[in-house]
Amino acid sequence: MAEEHNHNHEEENIIWITNEEGKEEAYEILFDFDSKDFDKSYVLYFPAGKGEDEEIEILASSYIQDEEGKQGQLKPVETDEEWDMIEEILATFLADEDEE
């Protein structure tokens, strides 16, 4: 199911996702990237407002950005190969964060 998301450039790391009940929820963007192998853009995000010591669930979606860059459409990750790539990139990202 595609979900609408948008963000305000003043809050560059926040996206708002409308859930199945029509309620908007804020999510903080961990990072986004483009994959040439799958010809898609991806975003990894988690519920906003979580403390640094709290365990968080990181979510991943592919997305299509609108022409103005203010809104887009989240799409589910479709294949095991995509998940493998995302997990590898996330592991590298987290390892780099631990080194800092």
Curated annotation (Swiss-Prot):
Source species, domain of life: Bacteria
InterPro entries attached to this UniProt entry: UPF0473
Pfam families hit by this protein: DUF1292 (PF06949)
UniProt record similarity statement: Belongs to the UPF0473 family.
HAMAP family: UPF0473
Name of the protein in question: UPF0473 protein LMHCC_1068
